[in-house]
């Protein structure tokens, strides 16, 4: 992974990563923290993952951390929606309501895909959040991780 990061950085590309798994974050916390602080430009995490990463108890601590590292941190919060923090710019979106949730498999991945689709197409942050929410809302209403 280090060579891939080095190559992307050398080519002036943005590097995005999802923390993806609470167990991995807890087990490899210091490695993840180094990546988040020093190697990544865009970080995706759910609320539990970001709190575990920084040993925080409150969501306000996660927001403060995200502002301090000066990266684009996107945190999904389930029924509370999602938030993007990039230095002092904070954008939030509510979760869609009245969904028939069947399976959460792939929700974070599809959210990240939608958000990144917005980034590469020069959407503003709010529209990136909307696209991510749109895709994740579709996948959780099906069994399995394919739309």
Regions found by a protein language model. Name each.
Residues 1-91, 123:
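Ribokinase/PfkB-type carbohydrate-kinase core domain
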Residues 68, 72, 96-147:
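Conserved post-catalytic alpha-helical subdomain immediately downstream of the catalytic base
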């Amino acid at each position: 992974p280090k060579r891939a990061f080095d190559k992307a950085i050398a080519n002036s590309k943005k590097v995005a990563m999802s923390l993806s798994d609470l167990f991995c974050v807890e087990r490899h916390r210091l490695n993840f923290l180094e990546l988040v602080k020093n190697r990544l430009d865009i970080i995706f995490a759910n609320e539990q993952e970001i709190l575990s990463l920084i040993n925080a108890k409150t969501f306000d601590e996660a927001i403060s951390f995200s502002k301090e590292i000066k990266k684009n941190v996107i945190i999904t919060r389930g029924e509370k929606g999602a938030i993007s923090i990039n230095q002092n710019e904070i954008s939030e979106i509510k979760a869609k309501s009245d969904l028939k949730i069947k399976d959460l498999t792939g929700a974070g991945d599809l959210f990240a895909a939608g958000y990144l689709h917005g980034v590469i197409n020069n959407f503003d942050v709010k529209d990136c959040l909307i696209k991510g929410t749109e895709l994740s809302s579709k996948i959780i209403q099906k069994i399995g991780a394919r739309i």
